């Protein structure tokens, strides 16, 4: 950390290692138990059927062998694979984070600039997904990923600190650098290396303007405030295969408020004035796609009393 002269800010560099504990997928235990029970039942049917066929009198052994082979082929196709108990446990996640940036005061300290670049390298990244049955969620380790990006923020206070302007933007390039699941049960190669990491917006931005005007300390209305803001994010992928996601979206909000005598604050607000419809979360389960969407235009009134 290096402080700039004349109180103009500071330049910093940081390196940190993060750790996220592993654990157990309790919700998937019932799936593995049912898979094991189905497998044992089918193996029992196979063994019993073979014994019955072997005991059929007056049937040539060649015919018995052919009947057993045909039965075995059918049962093999419907018998579940042996459950993999290792899926009950997911490993810890490790992350090395590198960041460099500057906090800089400009225009006689009327404008503050925050700028940062970062790189995060994650090993055994933990990602939540639904269990194969669609009932419950499990955590899996996704190999390695790398996230690089930049964040910039501007803040200015004008008119004797009565007007505050802010603007922020962030860009993140997050991809899997190694996420090879091998060959699936259907024989399909599953390799997500190079795909985007889900749930990470590629772009984020916000801007706001807020004003607070003093009236009189002796009036019933002491101060009057109003402002507006715009926020946006996207695009966002919802799965490791990058098959569906949320495009970039933006919303507009506004508020009007006042501070009254007796330490009472009123704030009338409006959110999503643009009526933008976007998904805040989405997933595939049991052959269907589900999504949770944001609230439509919303209006409200907050009343606060400080005592």
Segments and roles (model prediction):
Residues 12, 37-140, 146-148, 170, ...:
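Membrane-embedded beta-barrel scaffold of Gram-negative outer-membrane proteins
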Residues 94-98, 146-150, 199-205, 222, ...:
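Residues that define the transmembrane beta-barrel architecture of outer-membrane proteins
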Residues 19, 121, 159, 230-239, ...:
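C-terminal beta-signal and adjacent terminal beta-strands/loops
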Residues 110-123, 138-239, 304:
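Gram-negative outer-membrane beta-barrel transporters
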Residues 1-3, 101-105, 153-157, 168, ...:
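Transmembrane beta-barrel domains of outer membrane proteins
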Residues 2-6, 94, 106-108, 121, ...:
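Outer-membrane beta-barrel strand-turn architecture
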Residues 4, 15-21, 28-30, 106, ...:
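Transmembrane beta-strands of outer-membrane beta-barrel pores
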Residues 79-87, 132-139, 187-193, 236-240, ...:
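Extracytoplasmic loops and strand-loop junctions of Gram-negative outer membrane beta-barrel proteins
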